[in-house]
C-alpha cells in the first residue's frame, strides 16, 4: 500500500503569496528577464557589413573586448570614476545625514524633503544646468571675473572633474538617505550608556554611532557604485575626449556602428561585473539594508 | 508567417481581400504568432490602415511639414500623418532595425545623406516607388536624384528633399574672415585656438576634414595613417566633441568654442539670431543631401500622394526656410525666395557642380573599421 499520495502526507503549498506576487513577477519577467536574455543571445551573434545581425554562436565579441587594452581601459576608468564618486559621496553625504539625524529643529522634515527635491527635476536638465554654471560664460566664471579674481575664464567644463560634479549631484541623495536611515535605527540608549561610561561626544560617535551606521554606509556605497558604473549622461554632456565610460562605449557600438552583438557583449560583461559586486555584498552584508532607505523605519 | 502576412496585406491592399477577411486573418495569425512581437505588430498593422507615419528632425522642420504638407494631405485624403521625431540617423536606424520585419511601424523618414540611403538599401528596407505618381518629382534637380539612381537603378525608394554642407563655423570676435579663408580646413588645426576648438563626435566628418588637411581626396584616401596622425594631433586641441545640433549651437553661442565643423543650416540660424558666427565652406567642403525615404511595407499609394504633397513648391520652400537648408527643387524650374537664395549651400544653377558628396559605397564599406578606430583616436590612443 502506498501512502505518498494520501492528502495527509502531501506537502501543502501556500499559493497566496505567489498569487499576490504574480503581477510583479510577470512584469519583471517580461520587461527585465526576457530583454536581458535577448542581450545575452545577441552577444554571441555576428554583425554583417550592412549593420544587420547574423545568428551564430561564437565568443568572438568577448575575445575582441579583451584582445587589447583599449576596451578594458574604459572599463577600468569606469571602475575608477565609480570608486572616486563613492568616496566623494560618502564624505559629502555622511555629514548632512548625521546633521539630520541629530537635528531637533521643527524644520527637520522639510530639510529631508529638500534632499529629495532634485528628483522632481529631469536628470538631463540637472546635468545640462552645469553648463550654465561652469561654462566659459557661466555663472562661476562670470562671478570670479566680476570680483577681479581672474582675468580669463577658467576651463571648468568637459573634463573628469565636471563629470564627477554631475554624478555627485545625481547620486548624493541616495548616499544621504541610506546613511540617515541607518543612523535613525541606532538605539539612543546606547549613546547615553557610552556617555555615562565616560565617553565624550567624539568618542561616543567613534565607538558607537559610526560602527552601527556602517550597514547604511555600505548600502549607500553599493548603490552609488552601481549607478555610476552604468551611467551615460554626465560623461556625454559634461565630459570631454577621453572621459567616456563603459555605458557611452555601449551606446557608440550599438547606435554609432550598429554593432549590436559587440554592444551586447560589453553589456553582458558590465552586467557580470556589477552582478558579482552585488552578489558579494549580499553574501557578506545582506541586500535588505538597501531597502530600508526607501521604507523608513 | 511574415511572408504570408505580407502576401495577405498585399492582397488586401490590392482589393482582392475584404477588410473582414483581412482582420479575421490577423486574428488567427495573432493567436498563432505567440508573444514575441507578433500580436502587437499585427494590431499595429491593422490599425495603420487610416494613417501613415513620418519621422523627421523635429522643431521648425516638423512644424513646416505639418502646416504645409501633412494637414493639407489629411484634409484631402482623410489619412492621418503620424509625426515622429529622431535625434540622429544612427539612433533612428537602430529603432527601425528593432522593428524588423518592416510593415507598419515606420513608413517615411527624412534621411540624411546618400550613404544612409545605401545603408537602408543594404538592409533591404527599400521599396519601389512609381515616379509617374509623384508629379512634383519633375521639379527636383536631376543632379540630386542621380546618386540614388546609381544605388537602386531599378526603382527609387526615396525622393531628394534638401541639401546642406558640413563646413566650418567660427566666431568672428576671435577669428577674422580673412584668416578663416586663408587657412581653410587647416583652421581646425590652428594652434591659436587650442582648447577652444569643437568638432562633431561622428567619425565620418572628422576623417573627411583630416583628409582635406592632409591634402587628400576624402572619397579616395591613400594615406589613412596620415589622417589618423592628424586627428591625434587635433584631439588635445578639442574642447568638446558635440553630439547634436542643439549642443553645437549652444557651444558656439556661449563661446565655449571659437571654431568647429558645423552644419550650414544651424549656422544660418545662429547668424539670423545675431551671433557673430561666420561660415566657411573650404575647398572640398563636405556636402550632403537629405531625402524622404519610403520603408518597405508602406502603403505605396498613400506614400506617393504624401511625397507629392511634400515636394509641392509651397511645402518644400516653407520647410527649406524653416530648417535653413536649400530645397531639392531645381532653381531653373521653380522660383525660389530670396531667403533661400542667400542660404549656405544654395546652388542657383541646379547642377551642383563643384559640390563634393560622400561616396556612399566608399564610406559604408569602411564604417565599422574606421568608426571603431576613431573611438580609439578620440580617446587619445
Task: Indicate residue ranges for each PLM-predicted region.
Chain B
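A ligand-binding cleft/hinge motif common to bilobed small-molecule-binding domains
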Residues: 116-119, 253, 259-276
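N-terminal export signals
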Residues: 15, 21-43
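N-terminal secretory signal peptides
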Residues: 1-21, 44
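Extracytoplasmic ligand-binding site segments that recognize negatively charged/polar headgroups
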Residues: 59-66, 89-90, 110-253
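C-terminal segment of N-terminal export signals and the immediately downstream linker at the start
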Residues: 16, 38-58
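Early extracytoplasmic/lumenal segment of secretory-pathway proteins
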Residues: 49-118
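Mature extracytoplasmic/periplasmic domains
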Residues: 47, 290, 295-358
